[in-house]
Amino acid sequence: MDVNEGPLIRAEEHVREAGLKEQIKMRRSNGLEKLSPGEVEAVIIAGMGGGLVMRILTEGQAVAETLQECILQPQSEIAKVREFLLQNGYQIVQEEMVLDEGKYYPMMRVVPSKESEREKWDETQLRYGKLLLEMRHPILEQYLKREEQLKAEILEKLDHQRGEPVSYTHLRAHET
């Protein structure tokens, strides 16, 4: 499912090439609106901002409540997505992180939960992923070292520019 026709056409080609045309149906849909509650066991919501991921789950709550699991890969606002999930009846049961073409992508498998898990996560765990931290995920460690290096470079520039205006262009170049 996708809200745009182009990605559906490309997905249909991949499905056909994989010989899965009978098992996979394509639908043009805004979020989960073209699904009925109980129609599917799982969804993948990936390749979009965290705000949109949260909106899809909120607007499609009737469907989301009947899912056995969701695979999520938000590309921004990761901590907000984790907090939203934990406050809205989901438990994060698995986390992964990959590096592709210089960009870090966290992913999570979530399942419905009867109780709020929010109080079990501190701010660091929300930001970087409790399960990723617990497993000392090698890609997370690489990401943290990169962040440390970028922040050190910014601090060094600030030290050298004492009395000069701060270059916001330089700071923006280091945003993730």
Predicted regions and their residues:
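A short, conserved alpha-helix within the catalytic core of class I
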Residues: L52-E59
